[in-house]
Each structure stands twice: as structure tokens, then as C-alpha cells.
């Protein structure tokens, strides 16, 4: 087990290194000068040269890449060209809201997807299954931003249950959670649709296993057999999707 984990970590490190090299090369190939972008088109050449030296843009590309890797290793992500502030500080400031929002959305999507997948798998080919699959297809097709606007229009503007924007801070946890509810729902429903479809497929695959037939032969109903014996064996692909969704939700919330 330890050897497998070490191999996976080495594979992850190599993948990240290759991805970083490709991204760095693409950024270098793209036209434009960050220093001239920050100073404007009317900047004097000596001013541009001074800023390039300050940002480290006057050194060879390979040296800049190695400096960037070294900075990443110690948590120095550089300076934002747009906001002219350290990137690490910007990420840290946003994590106070983005991380709870991502966890909130992931909890909602899991709470919605698991029961829906269990119902659909237990009633495969029947009305509940068709209804759940239709709802998940709609959830996948509806854009997040459009659904978010509908939520704001209904619950914030028409009903006045939530605020249309802003975040009050964590001094009042209940007010903070309330402010995150509409964004969390808008992020959670499309992810719940994907998760429900994946879990339904995994549960249907489990239905053909011998231990499910044995559980049914002992008198368990299909929902009972799925809940007691099928869910744990169907969680491997589901946990993979959950990890990917958390990364997607956190990255989207930070951006």
C-alpha cells in the first residue's frame, strides 16, 4: 500500500511538472509584454525596462521558469499583473469565503445526489428512475449563471428571503451562511446532477453482483440491499467525482 501511494505521488509530481512547463511555454509564446501592459502604451522605454527588471522579465526564460518553480515551492506565487498585489495574498483573502462556499455547495450536491441515485437505481426503468434522469439531464444542461439569476430574481428580489449580493463577514455565522446559500445552491445543483448520474450507474453495476443476489435471497428488499451492501461498493467512482467537483467548485469560487 505504501509503495502504491509513493508511486502515485511521484506520478502526480511528474504530471504537475509537465503541466507547469507546458503552461509556462504557452504564456511565453502568447504575444504581449506584461510590463508595457501594466504601464500603458505611452510609457517611456526606460520605465518599461525598469519594470521588466523589477519583475524579473529581463532574465532568460529557463531561469524565470526555475525561479517560478522555486517560488511555488515556498508559497510565493508572484505578483498579479492586473491587481499589482501578491497572488498568494489574493488567494488567501478569497479562501475565507471561497472554501466555505465550496464545502457548502459540495454538501448540498451530495445530499441531493445520493437519495436521487438510490431511488433511480432501485426503481430502474420505472417512473422514479425516468423522473430522476430527466431532472439530472436538465441540471446538466442549465447554465450556472442563468440558474443563479433565476434564484436571485425569485428569492432575493420577489420574495426578499435572501440578499441579492454582498457578504457580511463571519462575525455573524448565521448571516454569513444565509448569504452563501443562493450561490451554493446555484453551484450545487449542476454538480448534483452529474454526481447522481455517476452514482446511479455505479449502483446498477453493483446490482448484478453475487452479494446483492444473496442479500435479496435472505429477504432484503432492493432498496435495503442497495443501502446496506451496494452503496459502499459503488463509492469508488463517486469519490473520484467528488474530489474533482470539490477542486472545480473551489477554483470557480476563488476566480
Language-model region placement:
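Alpha-helical transmembrane segments of integral membrane proteins
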Residues: 2-4, 16, 92-130, 144, ...
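Short amphipathic alpha-helical coupling elements at transmembrane boundaries
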Residues: 3, 40, 50-53, 67, ...
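N-terminal signal-anchor/signal peptide hydrophobic helix marking the start
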Residues: 6-12
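Hydrophobic alpha-helical transmembrane segments of membrane transport/permease proteins
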Residues: 16-66, 159-179
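Membrane-water interface segments at the C-terminal ends of transmembrane alpha-helices
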Residues: 22-29, 59, 70, 134-165, ...
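Hydrophobic aliphatic residues
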Residues: 26-30, 38, 42-43, 72-73, ...
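An internal, D/E-rich "acidic patch" concept
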Residues: 58-114
Amino acid at each position: 500500500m505504501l509503495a502504491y501511494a509513493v508511486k502515485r505521488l511521484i506520478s502526480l509530481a511528474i504530471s504537475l511538472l509537465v503541466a507547469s512547463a507546458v503552461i509556462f511555454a504557452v504564456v511565453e509564446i502568447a504575444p504581449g509584454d506584461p510590463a508595457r501592459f501594466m504601464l500603458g502604451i505611452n510609457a517611456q522605454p526606460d520605465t518599461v525596462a525598469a519594470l521588466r527588471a523589477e519583475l524579473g522579465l529581463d532574465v532568460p526564460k529557463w531561469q524565470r521558469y526555475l525561479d517560478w518553480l522555486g517560488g511555488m515551492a515556498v508559497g510565493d506565487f508572484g505578483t498579479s499583473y492586473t491587481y499589482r498585489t501578491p497572488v498568494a495574498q489574493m488567494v488567501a483573502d478569497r479562501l475565507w469565503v471561497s472554501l466555505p462556499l465550496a464545502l457548502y455547495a459540495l454538501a448540498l450536491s451530495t445530499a441531493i445526489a445520493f437519495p436521487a441515485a438510490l431511488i433511480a437505481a432501485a426503481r430502474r426503468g420505472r417512473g422514479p428512475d425516468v423522473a430522476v434522469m430527466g431532472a439530472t439531464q436538465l441540471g446538466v444542461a442549465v447554465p450556472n449563471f442563468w440558474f443563479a439569476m433565476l434564484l436571485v430574481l425569485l428569492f432575493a428580489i420577489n420574495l426578499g428571503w435572501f440578499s441579492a449580493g454582498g457578504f457580511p463577514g463571519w462575525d455573524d455565522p448565521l448571516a454569513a451562511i444565509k448569504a452563501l446559500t443562493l450561490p451554493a445552491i446555484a453551484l450545487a445543483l449542476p454538480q448534483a446532477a452529474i454526481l447522481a448520474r455517476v452514482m446511479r450507474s455505479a449502483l446498477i453495476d453493483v446490482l448484478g453482483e453475487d452479494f446483492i443476489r444473496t442479500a435479496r435471497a435472505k429477504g432484503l428488499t432492493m432498496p435495503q440491499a442497495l443501502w446496506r451492501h451496494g452503496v459502499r461498493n459503488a463509492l469508488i467512482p463517486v469519490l473520484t467525482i467528488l474530489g474533482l467537483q470539490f477542486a472545480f467548485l473551489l477554483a470557480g469560487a476563488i476566480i
